[in-house]
């Protein structure tokens, strides 16, 4: 998806480095220093314009949240939303989430969110999917024991691939939804801006799973 350039973005980001991290590696193992309270840490990879992560932070003041986004013009919009929200339990990171294990310590993360990731539909691009085995290995490194991975998409092909990938990796499924918005089991459903725009075109799929613990 092509994102329109925002001339104000870089200046705004430079003015709000208390809410935005541009060099995450030095914070490995010490992310709690970015928050006023030491609380369980939840991370969204590909946070977009921030609607999901901001609402999560608002509804869960007893958790700390980090939203990772690589596109400058997109994360600038998210940053403006974070600043305007006044919430102190959320930080944004301007980087590529593919290398998550290089800037989070083992077991530092309580939960991970993957919302509407790029489906990379061509077979030669399979390894780029955020639910491919190489990325699952990174998530397994940083998640605490039984920390949840929550994956949501509107792409049936990507969802089916992801179910197989998670299963082959030995993950334990806690819930699978083939039409999340029609669910009646009380599952938490905080929507992204993309989700609100496109959910009328078809079902939203979700899986929640965790990695097995070593006995």
Swiss-Prot record:
Pathway: tRNA modification; N(7)-methylguanine-tRNA biosynthesis. The keyword Methyltransferase applies. It catalyses: guanosine(46) in tRNA + S-adenosyl-L-methionine = N(7)-methylguanosine(46) in tRNA + S-adenosyl-L-homocysteine. GO terms for molecular function: tRNA (guanine(46)-N7)-methyltransferase activity. The keyword Methyltransferase applies. S-adenosyl-L-methionine binds at residues 44, 69, 96, 118. Coiled coil: none annotated. One of its GO terms (cellular component) is tRNA methyltransferase complex. InterPro entries: SAM-dependent_MTases_sf, tRNA_(Gua-N-7)_MeTrfase_Trmb, tRNA_methyltr_TrmB_bact. Disulfide bonds: none annotated. Gene3D superfamilies: Vaccinia Virus protein VP39. Its EC number is 2.1.1.33. It is an enzyme of class 2 (transferase). Catalyzes the formation of N(7)-methylguanine at position 46 (m7G46) in tRNA. Belongs to the class I-like SAM-binding methyltransferase superfamily. TrmB family. This is tRNA (guanine-N(7)-)-methyltransferase. It comes from Levilactobacillus brevis (strain ATCC 367 / BCRC 12310 / CIP 105137 / JCM 1170 / LMG 11437 / NCIMB 947 / NCTC 947). The gene is trmB.
């Amino acid at each position: 998806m092509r994102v329109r350039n925002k001339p104000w973005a870089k200046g705004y980001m430079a003015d709000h480095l208390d809410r935005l991290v541009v060099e995450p590696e030095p914070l490995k193992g010490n992310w709690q220093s970015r928050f006023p309270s030491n609380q369980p840490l939840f991370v969204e990879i590909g946070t977009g314009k921030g609607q999901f992560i901001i609402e999560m932070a608002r509804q869960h003041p007893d958790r700390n949240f980090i939203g990772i986004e690589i596109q400058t013009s997109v994360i600038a919009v998210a940053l403006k939303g974070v600043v305007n929200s006044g919430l102190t339990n959320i930080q944004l990171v301007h980087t590529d989430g593919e290398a998550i294990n290089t800037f989070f310590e083992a077991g530092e993360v309580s939960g991970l969110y993957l919302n509407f990731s790029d489906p990379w539909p061509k077979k030669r691009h399979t390894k780029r999917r955020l639910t491919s085995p190489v990325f699952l290995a990174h998530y397994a490194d940083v998640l605490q024991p039984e920390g949840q991975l929550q994956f949501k998409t509107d792409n049936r092909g990507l969802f089916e691939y992801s179910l197989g990938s998670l299963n082959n990796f030995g993950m334990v499924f806690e819930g699978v939804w083939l039409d999340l918005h029609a669910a009646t089991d009380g599952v938490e459903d905080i929507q992204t801006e993309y989700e609100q725009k496109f959910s009328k075109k078809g079902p939203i799929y979700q899986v929640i799973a965790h990695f097995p613990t070593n006995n």
